[in-house]
Regions:
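Distinct, well-ordered alpha-helical segments
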Residues: 112-119
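N-terminal helical cap/lid subdomain that shapes the substrate entry/recognition surface
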Residues: 2-90, 97, 108-112
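Short, conserved loop/helix-junction motifs that constitute active-site signature segments
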Residues: 93-96, 120-124, 153-154
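Short acidic capping loops at alpha-helix termini that bridge into adjacent secondary structure
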Residues: 33-34, 123-127, 155-158
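A short, structured active-site edge motif that brings together acidic residues
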Residues: 37-41, 106, 123-134
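Hydrophobic "anchor" residues on beta-strands that sit immediately upstream
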Residues: 4, 102, 159
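Conserved Lys-Pro-Asp/Glu-containing loop-to-beta segment of HAD-superfamily phosphomonoesterases
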Residues: 137-159
Length: 159
């Protein structure tokens, strides 16, 4: 019997629109032709594991630009890539009475602070697990084991 429901944040509770950010960087001369390679070079996975801060990540991004980037604008554009998926917030809220509901997300510190302030993520559900806080990202087993431990989950009763 299912007793626990886990939602992701980006792409589930919040629609991810990163295209404007990529276009902004490309216009500043950052080579965005191979997005997966760029994400590796900039260290996104390390950022989402909490090994580098959002400020450090944006410094790396700015250093890749051929033309100087205004740090405030860069940060604003970095933070402005999510839109609330109202139907998913309603679903998560609606399940709270009958299930234990959690959030599990690959996310860095800066995005988490911004999204929590904007949408109340930490108070929305029974518990949250942000990758930067535990030093592990999906799909590694470590983050799922931490969710099991922290939320006292039984995998067979969790979706």
């Amino acid at each position: 019997m299912i007793r626990n429901v886990i939602f992701d944040v980006g792409g589930v509770l919040l629609r991810l629109r990163y295209r404007p950010f990529i276009e902004y960087l490309a216009a500043a001369g950052v080579d965005m032709s191979d997005l997966p390679a760029w994400l590796t070079r900039v260290g996104l996975a390390a950022h989402e594991r909490g090994e580098i801060t959002g400020e450090e990540l944006l410094e790396r991004v700015a250093a890749m630009a051929r033309t100087p980037l205004d740090r405030s604008e860069l940060q604003a554009r970095w933070l402005d890539m999510f839109d609330r998926a109202h139907e998913m917030f309603e679903l998560a809220s609606g399940l709270m009475a009958d299930y234990r509901v959690y959030l599990l997300s690959n996310i860095g510190d800066m995005h988490w602070r911004h999204l929590d302030a904007q949408y109340g993520l930490d108070d929305l559900v029974h518990g949250t697990l942000a990758s930067f806080r535990v030093g592990a990202i999906k799909p590694t087993a470590a983050i799922y084991r931490e969710a099991e431990r922290r939320f006292e989950l039984e995998p067979a009763a969790t979706v």
